[in-house]
Amino acid sequence: MADSNNTGRASLIQRAALLRITTKTLANNLQNGSFKSLYHGQGIEFSGVREYLRGDDVRAIDWNVTARSAKPYVKVFEEERELQIFLIIDRSLSMQTGSRYKSRYQTAMEIAALITFAAEHNANPVGSVLFNGEIEFVCEPKSGPNQTMILLSHFDKEPDNRVKGSVLGNALTGAGKILKKRSLVFVISDFRMRDWEASLVHLASHHDVVCVRIGDPSDYELPEMGSVPFTDPENGIKKIMPTNSKSFKDSWREDGRMRLQRWTDGCLKHGGVPLKISTTEDPLTVLSSFFSKREVL
């Protein structure tokens, strides 16, 4: 399984110019596809007054301006059309595992970068929380190229492998406190930890939440290596895995399928939109297809 070593891989900062170009279609799909409705109904804001016209709602009359001008004026409001995006990214030890060529975290990092550049292209504010066994980094949503570079610089940093565990539940709760307006939230994780569902319920009651599960072929199939020692990266539990055993292979494959089904059911039950992406897939292709759909469920 892969570790978190990025040797030989260009950083997101180094790839910024190319990513800006490749995410234009993704940005358009985000703005016009599944989440188009989120650009509407974010609230209304006062934009000025104009003279009353026949048919206007009399409840909109601005009586102060009308009194000063001796002509009836009505208040004009405009709908906010700004979509705010927030990324909750898992950097725990289990995210350092993956395929031979790419870890789960490297896949998550690419997904986060693509969404960040799509947000920049649409002038959408974007922020993030990074976590492992503790909250590592918090950035409130802002818009513009400088914000993009700040986020990418943190996505590029090597995860701290000294910190065990995962505080996804705390990250979800913290995001709910940070976000002051309805937002599109992406939770990017392998979701191996427990006790995150209650926090998802609360977050999804105020925001639109997409749960992005980073999978890997090793979730279902392991190479035949005989009996090998295995240490769970999250809890440190050690066990022997007989990878040549047919019964073990069958059990491993079925457990992987059941975990995926439980996660999918849990997301839907608690208000999240499930999206699975494998370390072997192209994140841009998967995200473009996801955003271009008129319905996500």
Residue ranges and their predicted role:
Residues G48:
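Acidic, metal-associated active-site segment
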Residues M1-N32, L38, E51-D56, V65, ...:
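Exposed, interaction-prone extracellular/peripheral surfaces
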Residues V58-A60:
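N-terminal juxtadomain amphipathic helix
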Residues Y39-G43:
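A positional/architectural concept
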